[in-house]
């Protein structure tokens, strides 16, 4: 998406066929709710994806500050995505925060890390006051710059654009999208404006194959890897290899999560670890 593009976000409250909403809102771009906690699935999600141009999917979080619950919710989300590929997966964090800001932040980052390790671009959605009260958002944006989608409404009048209400923009660093209304059309519909161009150029392609940069072209075409790698000494920690990128893993719990979803854990000599790691871009 480009700056000043619009998109709508929808859930099971909308119909399976999004054509009427697209025609009335003026955009076919959507972000679709797929799951909530580990108990709710939007049964319309696939149909909604099929009748629109989805740019992302979202999960409504209930994990608060519980990192283990965050992990289970991330896996549940990933296991129930519609078949249409997207770049963005969104964490909707607007209820059930604990009183421990650091616990909330750590759980959020754990969820986003799992999303990133699957090759998607994680996005954090919420409201500014709720975020500032419950989350150390600087930690989130330090790891995932420009990853914020913030909702803030001037009123509940029908507003197809944010013209005339920019004074209500939730001034924060790293805001990629602004959800400026929940009433883009009569009868309620969330609509957002894009503030930053997408920072990728390729067709959406979530993690399915991971190619080794050191292999030949023919080998790259046939080889698939899903690995968490550590050195024999353990001094270098763990890394995951995702879409030709190496991603440091700070939490051993992330390794356990990746193993649950099919990643192989390998251990190599320290020198080999360094050589392999250098073969991948960050």
Indicate where each model-derived feature is located:
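Short, surface-exposed polybasic-aromatic patches that bind anionic ligands, especially phosphate groups
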Residues: 216-282
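Functionally critical loop-and-helix segments that line ligand-binding/catalytic clefts
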Residues: 1-14, 19-24, 141-220
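Ordered hydrophobic segments in well-structured contexts
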Residues: 7-9, 29-33, 56-58, 90, ...
């Amino acid at each position: 998406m480009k700056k000043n593009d619009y998109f709508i976000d929808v859930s099971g409250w909308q119909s399976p066929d999004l054509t009427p909403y697209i025609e009335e809102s003026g955009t076919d771009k959507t972000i679709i709710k797929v799951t909530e906690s580990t108990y709710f699935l939007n049964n319309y999600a696939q149909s909604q994806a099929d009748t629109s141009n989805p740019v992302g999917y979202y999960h409504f979080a209930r994990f608060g500050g519980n990192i283990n619950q965050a992990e289970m919710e991330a896996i549940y989300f990933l296991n129930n995505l519609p078949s249409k590929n997207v770049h963005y997966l969104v964490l909707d964090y607007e209820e059930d925060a604990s009183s421990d800001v650091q616990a909330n932040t750590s759980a959020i980052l754990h969820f986003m890390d799992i999303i990133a390790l699957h090759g998607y671009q994680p996005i954090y959605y919420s409201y500014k006051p709720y975020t500032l009260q419950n989350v150390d958002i600087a930690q989130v944006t330090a790891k995932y710059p420009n990853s914020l989608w913030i909702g803030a409404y001037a009123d509940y009048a029908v507003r197809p654009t944010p013209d005339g209400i920019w004074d209500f923009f939730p001034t924060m660093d790293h805001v990629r999208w602004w959800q400026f209304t929940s009433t883009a059309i009569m009868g309620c519909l969330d609509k957002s404006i894009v503030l930053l161009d997408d920072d990728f150029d390729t067709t959406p392609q979530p993690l399915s194959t991971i190619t080794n940069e050191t292999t030949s072209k023919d080998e790259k075409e046939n080889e698939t890897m899903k690995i968490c790698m550590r050195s024999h000494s353990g001094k270098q920690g763990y890394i995951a290899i995702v879409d030709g990128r190496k991603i440091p893993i700070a939490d051993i719990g992330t390794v356990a999560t990746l193993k649950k979803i099919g990643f192989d854990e390998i251990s190599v000599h320290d020198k080999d670890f360094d050589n392999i790691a250098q073969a991948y871009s960050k």
